[in-house]
Amino acid sequence: MDILDVAPQEYKVGNNLQANPVGLVGSHIEGRFLNIVARTSVRKNLEHCFQQAKIDIADQLIAPLVTANAVLTESERRSGCALVDFGADTTTISVYKNNILRFLTVLPLGGNSITRDITSLQMEEEEAERLKKAYGDAFYEEEEDQEEATCKLDDDSRTIKVSDLNNIVEARAEEIIANVWNQVQLSGYEDKLLAGIIMTGGAANLKNLDEMLRKRSKIEKIRMAKLPRNTVHAPSNVLKKDGSQNTLFGLLF
């Protein structure tokens, strides 16, 4: 494993805890740090790709930290919050308190996990992704007095019950949310998130996913960060307002 970055947590100068020990006098000093690590093979493979393309690497930045800089306010970091980035293949959980990164982990579950599950209804992934975006609902409830809703495949070859589709969506979404909240609990800060939970990422747009997280966590203060805090000027056909480009925007700021 390689250490990619180090986030200082606190220092102890003598018997006193300090956020910044510079300029203080003491007989001894201790420090607590959060090490952000990744498999060595992943980093080397990434560097090799750029070398093969003859592109120089100016710097290596960690995506969750870049995203946090783009979407979190200073007040949220100070008060305590959890940033949950629902991506296609992974879900990242970052916990902040007192302007310090306290916890960071990546789960190997994301929006594509739901899409692949939907393919069990005998369709290709492209079609499954379309249906997920159009009809997917983490808390689907069908009205008793209404006719059962259905959706058609693109080629009109057959129809699928929306309830069958969302049984699959809800099951996988529940697994992802359960794992997210478990990681927040492991951080030890689940009762210190005064600013609540901030959701971002393309997969966070699944209907009622925020309600599922609210029900699991019992935290009412949950917001969706679909755009970065800074102003971005771009053509409407380029700028996506769904949170999927927030890491990219963070690299620009």
Give residue ranges: language-model regions:
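Short beta-alpha connecting loops at secondary-structure transitions
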Residues: 102-103, 116, 161-164, 195, ...
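Phosphate/pyrophosphate-binding loops at sites that engage ATP/ADP/AMP, CoA/4′-phosphopantetheine
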Residues: 177, 181-196
